[in-house]
């Protein structure tokens, strides 16, 4: 049961991370690249 709870927890953390990155990412992309935010986020994380 604890593992099942961890599954949604991980998803929630991912969503929160994306939301946090969406702020600065929008400024960099211009706001129109919201669709590629997820792809950009991965690259950003690697460079960061």
Curated annotation (Swiss-Prot):
Region (Disordered): 1-48
Lineage top rank: taxon: Bacteria
UniProt cross-references to Pfam families, sorted A to Z: YuzL (PF14115)
Amino acid composition bias (Low complexity), ranges on this chain: 9-18
Name of the protein described by the UniProt record: Uncharacterized protein YuzL
Source species: Bacillus subtilis (strain 168)
Gene this protein is translated from: yuzL
